Structure formats: C-alpha cells, structure tokens
C-alpha cells in the first residue's frame, strides 16, 4: 500500500534528504557469543562505524519512560523518537494506578461494571498473561481481579494468552500459578481458556490466526478440555509447542454470549486490534463470523480511533513532534516499512495520530506470508529498500524514515543462523540506500529502537526470544549538501548520556530547523576542530 498526499509540494530543484534508518532490534553488546549482530558479516555498517561519527544511546528503562531495567520495544521506541522527549509510558501509568489501588476509581471501569451488573452478564477478562511488560503486565491482570472482587462481580472468566516471545519460551506455568493464587485469594474468577499469542495477537492481517482465537471465545460447540491450565501447557511442551504457539484450549463452559462484557487488558494497541475488531465491528470482512455476539468491550488503552469500545486509560495528547515540525515548515517527509513495523513509523512516530500530516507520504511493503520469519530472514528488505530509493530519487523529501524489521522479527525466533542472515541482509540494504542518498548530497542517521538480535541465548541457556536492555548504535554520515555550518571543521556525536529522545533534536539540527520547547531531548551533535576533509560516501560492500 502506498499513499500520495495532495499536499506534498514539488520543487524543481532536488532536495538533499536527511534519512533516518531504524534497524529494529539491532542492539549493541560487546560479547560475540550468542550475538547475531557481531557474528554477522556486516561490512557496510562496520566501515561506517569506524569512519564516521558514532555513539551508543539508551533505548530502555527510564530513558524511554519505562520502569528501570524494563526492556524497550518498538512502540515505545518510535514514540520516544518522534516526541523528542521522555514520555511516561502506558506501562508505568497503569502500573502506578494499580499499585496505588486506584483502579477502583477509574470512571470507565466503574461505568462498565455497573452496566454489566445491571444486565447480569459475565465479565470476561482477556489479554497477554506475562510480566514481559511489552504488551501487558500480569500485575495489571491481578489488579483487575481485585477490582472485580471489589465491585461484587461474581461471574468472571479469564481468557489468557500465553507469551513466550517477550518472556522465556517455556514460562507460562509460573504466570498461571500466580493467577490461580490470586483467584483463590479473592474468591473471584476462573481460567476459562488458554491460547498462544501467535493466534490471538496477530497484527499482519493473518485472519486465519485471529479466527481461531475468535472461535475459542465465542463458539458454544468448542470442546472443553478435561485438563487443567497447567496440564494443558505441559502437554503442549511434550508435543514440542512453546508458549507463543499453544493451540487454543477451552477449560470451562464459559464463552462470550449476548449481554456479556469484555475487558482487554493489553495496553499496547497493535497486536490487540484484530481480535477487538472481530468482536465488535458490524462491517467486518476478516473472516466469516459464525457466532456473532452483542457484547460490550472495554480496552485498557485506545487501540484505534473510531472503535466502538470504552477506554480505561485514554491517550494524553502530544504536541510539537518531529513530524509536526517538518510539516509546519512546509517540508515533505516519507515514511516506509514492512507490514510488521508500518504502524511504528506512522502512527507511533506521530504520537498516536492515524492521519498523515501535511506533506507526509506513507508506503507499506507487505511482509512475506510465512509462519515465522526465520523461514525467510531476508523478509521484504530488498523491496523496501528499492521503494525507498525510488522515493529518495524524486528529490522532494526533506526527511525520510525507513524501518528494517529483520533484526527484531527474526531475532524473536531465537534461531541464531536465521538472525545472522537477517542482519546481513539489512547491512547490504544500507549500502544500497547510502548510494542513493549520496547522489543527492544527503545525510544518513542509522540507529535502532531497541535491542534484540544481539542476544540470542539467555542466561538459562535457552533461546532468548525477547528484547534486551542493551544500548543501540547511532552512526551519522553527513552529506556534502547537509554539512552543518558554525560547527568548526567537523563534528562528533556525544559519547554518553544519550537516549532515543535525542534523535528528533538531532534530525532537526541536521535539517537546520528549530527545536520546539516541548522537546527536552538534546542534539547528539557536538563540534570538534579537525582539518577540513570531504565527507565521501563509501562504496557499499555487497
């Protein structure tokens, strides 16, 4: 899918662009062992790292508005990059509410419970059951169970999605034990179904996956297992199936019926939208719904504007973001990514705004239709690169943002050889991209939104499928037509104290645009006094 914006201005003279290349999941770790970044053959990025200004910046924890030691993620990373400031993320916002026992005072939740009690329906609580902190947190689920008990809701069914992606591949049992203990302590609720996130949380329009989760939740004929939740998980392990891929299993007679209510406690929108759309949209064409239900749905955060649901924690508006500054100065910008990361370079980078800005053109390159990306580690990087080069060659875009999904999406597989191939493909694409940028005298800023593929085996010796808290690299290749004036004869990048919030100020610096006061991040660029030399674009090695 590509889009043209009628508000895009066309200049006869070609623009030297500033290009931001986000290598999703390309973290930095010194150790070579189990490191798919260090073990990959990456001649282009290696050469750039040694020849051009570079540094490391933080992309996790407090530096991106998350709790200390909490791994970063793509949503938070792109939001922070676009905002140019540290924003308190939904994980922290909701966690504080739960910790302070303030769920009981949440207006949306209270109205929801009153309506449900009046109608006599069952409360269904669903979401990702883990402490990964990327899409949800088990403490929020525990808080909801306590909230339901405080409101006198007796009929409470839990539909839990197992993780194994942002957590260890075989960790579901400990989370189930935690929830069963909370159920016992409060006297409220039962675990009615289990389902791997692979089925319940697809975001790539693979509706055949979503339909399996939908049937589990709504089909009265769905078979009820005689096994307990823990027994079902262990049975999956015996069959070689890890948490992410656990087949849908119903554990009780409870399913969604007319008059019931659903609370979806995932706070990250992108992997929750499809299932909510299947449950609530009247005009829905993802798959044939055999068991339509008339239910109320409350989501923890706003998954998408216009969805017919209640929202417990509505978005807090952000102003003066990177894209807005570009648009306000009458400049054109181009955003592109594969399906898996398209929302991140558009919706999240723009602070949760769906509609393109004036002068903003978006281009989506379909991700390959494979079960898991280790089967095709190159993904659609070549097509993505070629489409981006075509956009750069038009000479109309001042800012270009491209996201390479490979290091993250293949890194999540936990398969070392595939992750190495993924990183090598991205390296070759950077070389091609650099040639195109250099022809116009533009600048390239290379970075990542969080770590992942630099750590493929965890401390327990098992495949590491989650993100990391490692820093990420930044490399600046300053183009001949984008040389900064008033900075001596050369530049360097700040050696320490940097974070993702500093990238937008750095990009505005390169574009010679003023930084809004709301952006508390600072440019990473610092002057040094060296003999002037041409900033030649190296030839790609591929």
Curated annotation (Swiss-Prot):
GO BP, sorted A to Z: glucose catabolic process; glycolytic process
Keyword Manganese: yes
Gene3D superfamilies given in the database record: Alkaline Phosphatase, subunit A, BPG-independent phosphoglycerate mutase, domain B
Superkingdom of the source species: Bacteria
Catalytic activity: (2R)-2-phosphoglycerate = (2R)-3-phosphoglycerate
Active site: 74 (phosphoserine intermediate)
Binding site for substrate: 135, 165-166, 197, 203, 268-271, 341
UniProt enzyme class: isomerase
Record key words, sorted: Glycolysis, Isomerase, Manganese, Metal-binding
MF (Gene Ontology): manganese ion binding; phosphoglycerate mutase activity
One Pfam short name: Metalloenzyme
Known cofactor(s): Mn(2+)
EC nos: 5.4.2.12
Role this protein plays: Catalyzes the interconversion of 2-phosphoglycerate and 3-phosphoglycerate.
Protein name, entry field: 2,3-bisphosphoglycerate-independent phosphoglycerate mutase
Gene this chain is encoded by: gpmI
């Amino acid at each position: 899918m590509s889009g043209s914006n009628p508000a895009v201005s066309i200049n006869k003279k070609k623009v030297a662009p500033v290009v931001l290349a986000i290598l999703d999941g390309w973290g930095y770790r010194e150790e070579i062992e189990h490191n798919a970044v260090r073990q990959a053959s990456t001649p282009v990025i290696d050469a750039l790292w040694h020849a051009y200004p570079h540094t490391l910046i933080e992309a996790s924890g407090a530096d991106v508005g998350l709790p200390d030691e909490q791994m970063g993620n793509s949503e938070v990373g792109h939001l922070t990059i676009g905002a140019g400031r540290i924003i308190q993320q939904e994980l922290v916002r909701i966690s504080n509410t739960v910790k302070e026992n303030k769920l009981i005072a949440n207006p949306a939740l209270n109205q929801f419970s009153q309506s449900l009690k009046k109608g006599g329906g069952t409360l269904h609580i669903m979401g990702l059951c883990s402490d990964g902190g990327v899409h949800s947190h088990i403490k929020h689920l525990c808080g909801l169970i306590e909230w339901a008990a405080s409101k006198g809701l007796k009929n409470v069914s839990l539909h839990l999605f197992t993780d194994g992606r942002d957590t260890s591949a075989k960790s579901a049992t400990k989370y189930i034990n935690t929830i069963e203990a909370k159920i016992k302590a409060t006297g409220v609720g039962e675990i009615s179904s289990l389902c791997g996130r692979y089925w319940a949380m697809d975001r790539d329009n693979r509706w055949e996956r979503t339909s399996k989760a939908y049937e589990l939740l709504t089909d009265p004929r769905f078979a009820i297992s005689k096994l307990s939740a823990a027994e079902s998980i262990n049975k999956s392990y015996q069959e070689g199936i890890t948490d992410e891929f656990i087949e849908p299993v119903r554990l009780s007679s409870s399913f969604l019926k007319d008059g019931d209510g659903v609370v979806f406690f995932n706070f990250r929108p992108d992997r929750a939208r499809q299932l909510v759309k299947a449950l609530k949209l009247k005009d829905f064409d993802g798959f044939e719904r055999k068991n339509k239900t008339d239910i109320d749905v409350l989501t923890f955060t706003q998954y998408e504007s216009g969805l017919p649901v209640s929202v417990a924690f509505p978005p807090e508006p952000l102003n003066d973001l990177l894209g807005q500054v570009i648009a306000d100065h009458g400049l054109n910008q181009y955003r592109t990514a594969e399906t898996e990361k398209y929302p991140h370079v558009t919706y999240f980078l723009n602070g949760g705004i769906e509609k393109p800005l004036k002068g903003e053109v978006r281009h989506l390159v379909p991700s390959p239709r494979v079960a898991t990306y280790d089967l095709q580690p190159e993904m659609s990087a070549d097509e993505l690169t070629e489409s981006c080069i075509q956009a750069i060659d038009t000479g109309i875009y001042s800012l270009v943002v491209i996201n390479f999904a490979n290091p993250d999406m293949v890194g999540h597989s936990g398969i070392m050889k595939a992750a190495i191939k993924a990183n090598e493909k991205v390296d070759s694409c950077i070389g091609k991209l650099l040639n195109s940028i250099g022809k116009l005298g533009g600048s390239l800023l290379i970075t990542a939104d969080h770590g992942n593929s630099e750590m493929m085996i965890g401390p327990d010796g098992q495949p590491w499928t989650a993100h990391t808290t490692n820093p990420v690299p930044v490399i600046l290749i300053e183009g001949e037509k984008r040389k900064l004036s008033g900075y001596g004869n050369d530049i360097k990048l700040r050696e320490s104290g940097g974070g993702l919030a500093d990238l937008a100020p750095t990009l505005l610096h390169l574009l010679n645009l003023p930084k809004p006061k709301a952006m508390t991040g600072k440019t990473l660029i610092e002057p040094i006094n060296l003999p002037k030399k041409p900033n030649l674009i190296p030839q790609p090695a591929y």
